[in-house]
């Protein structure tokens, strides 16, 4: 395998300077092996590297879906019996393949590379290699606390310390209620202090004090 990659790299390097030597290297490797394996992007007849300058590429598409073929496919899907001629037409449509035609300009020969048929593609879609059920991630299940396990592990502890452990939501609610009660208490204390100061600054005015103030004003 390493020799094959090395010879292919050497042939590509000698393609512009010495194309004959490059073709000889590719031919020497293919002739020395029994499997008759050819290189990619290489003409199997003259061992010329198939590049844009010395090759012509064409694509022969698959057979098109005609209204008649569509009608036969619908009948087949409904489990209707088809005649021999109709079944042959449907089979030919399903087995049709796209063909890539590469013509070498050096030897003027064409190499065909066949694609996959419609039936093969449909089987791949219906039976994928990796099913979707395996790819779906499982959600982690919550573990429920076992009361027997808690009782066995909490020997020597009081029941209050075992079963009265507050959760995070309960602790947050208790802390918030304590804070609100403290603020209300401070507000009431401040209000009482302000009312006491106002009462000390303003003297009490009764009827006796009013008469004494009038008397003092008349004497003056």
UniProtKB/Swiss-Prot annotation:
Location of Phosphoserine modifications: 126
Signal sequence, renumbered to the chain: none
Polar residues: compositionally biased ranges: 119-136
Keywords of the record: Phosphoprotein
Top-rank taxon: Eukaryota
Residue numbers bearing the Phosphothreonine modification: 130, 139
Keyword Phosphoprotein: yes
Spans annotated as Disordered: 117-181
Record's compositionally biased regions (Low complexity): 171-180
Entry keyword annotation includes NAD: no
Annotated TM spans: none
Family designation: Belongs to the UPF0711 family.
Name this protein carries in UniProt: UPF0711 protein C18orf21
Native source species: Homo sapiens (Human)
Lineage: Eukaryota, Metazoa, Chordata, Craniata, Vertebrata
């Amino acid at each position: 395998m390493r020799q094959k990659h090395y010879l292919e790299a050497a042939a590509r390097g000698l393609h512009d300077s010495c194309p004959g030597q490059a073709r000889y290297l590719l031919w020497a490797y293919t002739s020395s092996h029994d499997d008759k394996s050819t290189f990619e992007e290489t003409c199997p007849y003259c061992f010329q590297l198939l590049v844009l300058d010395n090759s012509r590429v064409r694509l022969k598409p698959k057979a098109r879906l005609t209204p008649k073929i569509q009608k036969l496919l619908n009948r087949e899907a409904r489990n209707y019996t088809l005649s021999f001629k109709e079944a042959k037409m449907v089979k030919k449509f399903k087995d049709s393949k796209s063909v890539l035609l590469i013509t070498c300009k050096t030897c003027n020969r064409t190499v065909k590379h066949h694609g996959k048929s419609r039936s093969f593609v449909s089987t791949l879609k219906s039976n994928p290699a990796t099913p979707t059920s395996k790819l779906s991630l499982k959600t982690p299940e919550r573990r429920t606390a076992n009361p027997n396990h808690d009782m066995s592990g909490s020997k020597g502890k009081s029941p209050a310390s075992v079963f009265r452990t507050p959760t995070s939501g309960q602790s947050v609610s208790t802390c918030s209620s304590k804070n609100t009660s403290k603020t209300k208490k401070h507000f009431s204390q401040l209000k009482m202090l302000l009312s006491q100061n106002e009462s000390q600054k303003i003297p009490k005015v009764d009827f006796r004090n009013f008469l004494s103030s009038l008397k003092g004003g008349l004497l003056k």
